[in-house]
Amino acid sequence: MAWTKHQLFLAGLMLVTGSINTLSAKWADNFMAEGCGGSKEHSFQHPFLQAVGMFLGEFSCLAAFYLLRCRATGQSDSSVDPQQPFNPLLFLPPALCDMTGTSLMYVALNMTSASSFQMLRGAVIIFTGLFSVAFLGRRLVLSQWLGILATIAGLVVVGLADLLSKHDSQHKLSEVITGDLLIIMAQIIVAIQMVLEEKFVYKHNVHPLRAVGTEGLFGFVILSLLLVPMYYIPAGSFSGNPRGTLEDALDAFCQVGRQPLIAVALLGNISSIAFFNFAGISVTKELSATTRMVLDSLRTVVIWALSLALGWEAFHALQILGFLILLIGTALYNGLHRPLLGRLSRGRPPAEESEQERLLGGSRTPINDAS
């Protein structure tokens, strides 16, 4: 069945805003500007402040939810139920995981390429599958285990591509390796977040936009408060600011004042995450979970292609191979091969409802699927 203009718009919005989210964060990292007190020109490395901005974008989803709820008042078939009771503190543990994982990923993005960052995030399938078996009592089928193995193989290939690629003075080999490992570590935390959301949040049938906004509120408030002690905690060579501390928000604002384009990149990152979450939820509702996963894979291609075009990274054939293997792993884990096999065997393809149930039940996307 042909897509409507509304569905095409939602798919395009998800693809564009998802790509902007990662690329704008990397664009901000690439800027050089003077900091406070006449400090020398240095790169904009403020991952924790960027994470605060991302949570601000997620927090804005609460406004979208209440707008939808006001619009849906009096409609009996509305999915936005104003009477849904839930305890907001249920979102605190997933929000803490989201805060930790997001901060790690922003630190890693300073060290590695945007395309590797996006591809290595596919590792979440491995840990989600293992944790769902251990803590949710789920039994994985053969195709899901094969998907996990394929994902591991794809991660190895992408890692080899990073090792064999030429590295400039900004991204030394040791930093690239550290960045890649931090991304993998972050996916463990994201997988824990997904398990917590499924165990404690999904059963309350909270609207996804409300869930995203509530987690964003917790993350924004907590991480904003943590910026104060981070200003004084020494981090040595791990730090990217002249004072050598874990985070220097004042230095970041001084750099933004001296290079206004950094503000453009940060605003792009903040706004894109809000629209990306809204578009992703809408695509799953209007089309299918399969479509959302295909678009997410296309997002990786767009990020990789634009990074090459902008000269942010060098071409390496192993990255293509690694991405294809990761794509196969994702497809196997989420059962995307079954409709294809059904058509090849001239069987009746499964209905869209059962497809959504299988995909969302087998591997839920985190409520706030960031960059």
From Swiss-Prot:
UniProt keyword terms in alphabetical order: Glycoprotein, Lysosome, Membrane, Mitochondrion, Phosphoprotein, Signal, Transmembrane, Transmembrane helix, Transport
For the EamA domain, which residue ranges apply? Answer: 104-160
Annotated coiled-coil positions are none
Where is the PTM Phosphothreonine found along the chain?
A: 365
Query: Would the keyword Glycoprotein turn up in this protein's UniProt record?
Result: yes
GO MF annotations, alphabetized: transmembrane transporter activity
Oligomeric state and interaction partners are given as: Interacts with SLC25A5.
Q: Which Pfam families match?
A: SLC35F
Q: Where in the cell is it found?
A: Mitochondrion; Lysosome membrane
Q: What does this protein do?
A: Involved in the maintenance of mitochondrial membrane potential in pancreatic ductal adenocarcinoma (PDAC) cells. Promotes pancreatic ductal adenocarcinoma (PDAC) cell growth. May play a role as a nucleotide-sugar transporter.
Glycosylation site residues: 110
Give the GO terms filed under biological process for this record.
Answer: negative regulation of mitochondrial outer membrane permeabilization involved in apoptotic signaling pathway; positive regulation of cell population proliferation
Q: Which family does it belong to?
A: Belongs to the SLC35F solute transporter family.
**Any stretches that span the bilayer, and where are they?**
48-68, 89-109, 117-137, 140-160, 176-196, 216-236, 261-281, 295-312, 317-336
Residue ranges of the region described as Disordered: 347-371
Query: What cellular component terms from Gene Ontology apply here?
Result: lysosomal membrane; mitochondrion
Annotated membrane topology: Multi-pass membrane protein
Protein source organism: Pongo abelii
- The signal sequence is 1-25
What is the name of the protein in this document?
Answer: Solute carrier family 35 member F6
